[in-house]
Amino acid sequence: LATDSAGRETDIAVDHAEHAHLEASDIARVRDIMRHHGLTATVSSIHINGWIGDHHKWAGALWAVRLWLRRDLSAEVDHWVYIGDSANDEIMFRHCPQSVAVANIASHWGQLQHFPRYVTAGQRGIGFAEMVQALLEIK
């Protein structure tokens, strides 16, 4: 399990790249076992996450923007930028035309059906900083 499991209330997370290092076949096997037992399961850059229900990042983003900003994200999604790094961001890449992925998305590319519009040259935090710098330059 992931080291932050004690703080999780709505999902289970299995570490595959934060402190442990699982092979791709083992990651797929854990994800498939979760799905076989009725969980929704995705793979992030560090965890294999499983949960009960059909909630996901896009539904959560719609809810959070409506609740805290009193705005309709689906009506103005063209004005938002989403940045991700793994296969579990695919639903956001599908819904967000201004989507960005950091370079380490490359290891998940073959799992995607919906792709980010832009991929940074830098990985992880460096890629995020690259995206922020680009936004600041065009503002």
Task: Label each residue range with its predicted role.
Residues L1-V81, S86-H95:
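Conserved acidic, metal-coordinating active-site core of Asp-based
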Residues R71, S99-K139:
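Asp-based, Mg2+/Mn2+-dependent phosphohydrolase catalytic module
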